[in-house]
Amino acid sequence: MFSSKERFADLFLKRLEMTCGKSFKDSAKLDQYKTLGNMVREYISADWIETNEKSRSNSGKQTYYLSIEFLLGQLLEQNLMNLGVRDVVEAGLKEIGINLEEILQIENDAGLGNGGLGRLAACFLDSLASLNLPGHGMGIRYKHGLFEQKIVDGHQVELPEQWLKNGNVWEVRNADQAVDVPFWGEVHMTEKSGRLHFRHEQATIVTAVPYDIPIIGYETGTVNTLRLWNAEPYAHYHGGNILSYKRETEAVSEFLYPDDTHDEGKILRLKQQYFLVCASLKSIVNNYRKTHKSLSGLHKKVSIHINDTHPALAVPELMRILLDEENMSWEEAWHITVHTISYTNHTTLSEALEKWPIHLFKPLLPRMYMIIEEINERFCRAVWEKYPGDWKRIENMAITAHGVVKMAHLAIVGSYSVNGVAKIHSDILKEREMRDFHLLFPNRFNNKTNGIAHRRWLLKANPGLSAIITEAIGDEWVKQPESLIRLEPYATDPAFIEQFQNNKSKKKQELADLIFCTAGVVVNPESIFDVQVKRLHAYKRQLLNVLHIMYLYNRLKEDSGFSIYPQTFIFGAKASPSYYYAKKIIKLIHSVAEKVNYDPAVKQLIKVVFLENYRVSMAERIFPASDVSEQISTASKEASGTGNMKFMMNGALTIGTHDGANIEILERVGPDCIYTFGLKADEVLSYQENGGYRSREYYQHDRRIRQVADQLINGFFEGEADEFESIFDSLLPHNDEYFVLKDFSSYADAQERIQADYRERRKWSEHSIVNIAHSGYFSSDRTIREYAKDIWGIKPMM
């Protein structure tokens, strides 16, 4: 099919006419995109079947990765690259007058995630397939994703994400493998032959229908599967209002992260989580039973990984299957469960560690609650035996306490491995946040520093840079990213530096064009592109960035002797629809942009840009063009971060706190090649535990801080005097929870160092190349090898 450009072009034209019922000249770009996508899917079908057979018959284990998010982005170009046929396709299409780039832009980003959690899951799937490892994803097929972000008068407005409006060429619906998921109802117990038996009756059934997406490895022939579950009405429903039932059923897979500020939203989120877990475990068990009569050896052949706490119900659901369907004893079922399930923790933020009110949980999932109660009872008894009389410890460690079910505790107790995602994050978990659990299960905790799919974020996103790297050190880095370290000597090579700078200039011009087309702002491509793109949250401190821009604006206006190297500040972020404070930060960014971009006294030196509806395909345009990577979260709050790695891999220099993977980047590149500032994690934690921080002191003693804080409420933004009162209050009356004012001066100093260093372009480029050379460690290939060896016990398929 892809053996030559001529053969491909001929088959493409025939397939287009056959499937679309149109002549080539009458076909639309969408027709051409679907034709190409279907050809790729057909091309890999034999490998997909073979991989599934290998996974099933493999003498070792296979892994199932359960995640509420999978932020895939666009798949067509990545698949063409992984199959090694992109050049043939591009040349063949050119022969018949089609520009491949135009076809690629037709594809919608898959609306299956929000931020780092989902993108990490997608990177892991890429590495699993590219390393020939038997690993598959399990998620939900959200009809409308998170939301499509629109900016109206500086305010975020959420619209349904229409990513499926033209269908999805990659998915295969497997209705014959649908399973039923029960909600509500009652559990009845009967005793038979001295054992209790449980029946879940009068439940409301939702049918979970799987849609499978192929995950194609890079030049391996391995095609793993991402299975996404779609919620559909039960065919034999005989309850009340059928229309109401249909709406409630379809809502389960309609949106990612429905608003949970009210009970209805909490119930829907909990439904989603059990829907994912129940459907996935039934599918896993059904697949396992094809080659095994009993589930007694499940843990020897299957590893189930839960990505954050959303799939933590895998613990009681696997117990339910083993107890109620296999009639195992509690002890045997528990042994299998805690040798099958592993858990990644992604946060130290207490509000992000899910807790479900029992008064909602118990009626919705009655059998799950019964099993969790028993797990909790047995666990608390074990803690008592180890720490007799220590009621406080038991209270702190209990899975159910104070009217809630603590999902992180459930995940820890029911897993054989608990890992953090950066060294400092794992240390904080062990020494502080989960100290009691670590003392009880010292061998259960470990670290696996996150990684990114370098073939997407460098090879695909930045082909120009990839080409000059390959010219310098060969192409081994594509499959062995650690070999990028061989690039380090080229950091002082004048010819390589010139090539690097030329490519960077080209990518910056392309981003400048995109900014003008999407935001209507003219930016100077020769300016410093200073970029902060990530989920909007107070701890990520987009506010610190904005307040510093306001300070620069003030100084440029007031001090005629002050000047800076032109700097363009670029933001991209979505705020949760119910996160009022985060949405106010978005509005503030736009108000500052309005002030700065149209002031003739400063607009040649500063520009502020907010890119609407930030997503994976946009990120692929942003990272290669960036000079400065903003990784400025409050120390101890960012578990790892992966944006820092994507920027690093494309030669941007990090300005960052001593947090997450920033610390590990610093360890590799050295202090000259990164700009660190601010409080360290232990200092932040000390303030939080012992007090002593008073933000008003910084407000009173630093004129810069006082001026920008006052401007939030004194009419500086015309017609918006009350708009940012909540932000002002967060900094002063509420004492600045995330230490924005405390770190302001240190951050401003780091920005001054950036200003000075960027003027020495050769030295700046040297530091950029050093970053690229050390970025191979942060490939998800390395991360997945560690998971495979240390946690899952899986080996490459032969």
UniProtKB/Swiss-Prot annotation:
The protein's enzyme class: transferase
| Keyword terms | Allosteric enzyme, Carbohydrate metabolism, Glycogen metabolism, Glycosyltransferase, Pyridoxal phosphate, Transferase
Q: Which InterPro entries match?
A: Glycg_phsphrylas, Glyco_trans_35, Pyridoxal_P_attach_site
A Pfam family reported for this protein in Swiss-Prot or TrEMBL: Phosphorylase
Q: Which GO terms describe its biological process?
A: glycogen catabolic process
Gene3D superfamilies in the record: Glycogen Phosphorylase B (3.40.50.2000)
Name the reaction it catalyses. [(1->4)-alpha-D-glucosyl](n) + phosphate = [(1->4)-alpha-D-glucosyl](n-1) + alpha-D-glucose 1-phosphate
EC numbers, comma separated? 2.4.1.1
Q: Which prosthetic group or cofactor does it need?
A: pyridoxal 5'-phosphate
**What PROSITE patterns does the entry give?**
PHOSPHORYLASE
Q: Which domain of life is it from?
A: Bacteria
Reported induction: Expressed exclusively on media containing carbon sources that allow efficient sporulation.
In this chain, where does the modification N6-(pyridoxal phosphate)lysine occur?
A: 646
A GO CC term? cytoplasm
- Cited PANTHER family: GLYCOGEN PHOSPHORYLASE (PTHR11468), GLYCOGEN PHOSPHORYLASE, LIVER FORM (PTHR11468:SF3)
Which NCBIfam families does this UniProt record tie to the protein? P_ylase
Question: What is stated as this protein's family in its record?
Answer: Belongs to the glycogen phosphorylase family.
Function comment: Phosphorylase is an important allosteric enzyme in carbohydrate metabolism. Enzymes from different sources differ in their regulatory mechanisms and in their natural substrates. However, all known phosphorylases share catalytic and structural properties.
Q: What is this protein called?
A: Glycogen phosphorylase
- Record the organism: Bacillus subtilis (strain 168)
* Name of the gene encoding the protein in the UniProt record: glgP
